[in-house]
Amino acid sequence: LTPGMKTIAGRLAYLLAGAGVIASFDPPSVAVTIGGESLGARQYQLFVVCNGPTIGGGHRAAPRARPDDGLLDACLVEASGTLDLVALLRRLSKGEHLDAEGVTYRQLQSAELAFDRVLKVNTDGEVIETRICRYRVLPGAARFIA
């Protein structure tokens, strides 16, 4: 998204950009390890790792996340049909997706996601290309007022 799109359209800009990606996206196989425990490899359509409850435009992807709890929250969405994904994304926007089929939600101190190919990954607004994403909590590295 361009800065202009974000300013003009707000949440709608994220939805429009996402719709284009959904239509052409080929879900990768992702080997997931959380806190040293392997969850195996599956095809995932979406994953987020958050320190707060919302992502782009206010969507509540990690409704249990708190910046001061010493944990990161991960939400992984298994690959599904386009209509199923669109319905799930509506629930995700409101933070009502945690009990949905195909959704894995964990609170963690460390995680690794290894993709079967290089992917473009949005890391807090910056896009990087990678085959592995590693996340870990660094206690005391930042101070927050909550």
Which residues does each PLM region occupy?
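Long C-terminal subdomains/extensions of small-metabolite kinases
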Residues: L1-A146
